[in-house]
Amino acid sequence: MYKTEANKIIVSATALDVKATLECGQLFRYEKTDDGYTVKSGAHSCDIYASGSDVIIETASVDYFVNFFNLDRDVNRTKRELSRFPELRSALESCGALRILHQPLFETIISFIISANNNIPRIKAIINRLCGMFGDVFPTPEQLAAVPVRQLNAIGCGYRSQYISDSAKICAETNILNRLHAAGTEDAEKMLMSLPGVGRKVADCVTLFSLGRLEVFPVDTWMLKTQRQGMETEPQLRRRVMEKYGIYAGYAQQVLFYYNAILRNN
């Protein structure tokens, strides 16, 4: 599936669709380059480009990005399991080897608080400005907790500024991050929703994109638009699709989002 060399990860393109993985709404710290993408996470970065039938990930943090891209997971097995559902087949065929990332927990919490009622270009810009305050590195809970709310306002966080500050302080002053890693999915979601600015959708995104709980199905406006049956409420839709797709519901959500919101909408 992949092999590593000094400062390089070589992945078969059949095991990693870079565009689908980066542009499906789960990650905000990436930029297109002339020959591929640059991705940043925490204090780490990598450059990604195609080489024949392979994807090359150049980085000084090889082990970090093997884990970040979840390269030990057989994504094509997941796709085969979901292909028994006829309504998913077009999306599955269109998204290639989209992978659910394994992102740092605190960074994911803050990024998705910023994402609420926002669009991707603006989210990316705010997060880039936030990281720019710390040398282009995502801040630790302690660093972010020390930032005055007015400075968060100044970089465009708006009404989310107080939520970000308060959540950073909780993460800095308690052991909630360790508890989240150890908790079951339901308990993790309850803990997440105790943080200021974290509702059900943000909690679902964090448990899926950081904690790796693939059974979670975040419901956004695109899911309501394309997956809703009759007068279903968001909780009813979420419960139905999670029961239907089981342990792969989160993967189904990502391919449906990428297919409907990105591919068919452009």
Annotate each predicted stretch with a short phrase.
Residues 1-266:
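HhH-family (HhH-GPD) DNA N-glycosylase catalytic core used in base-excision repair
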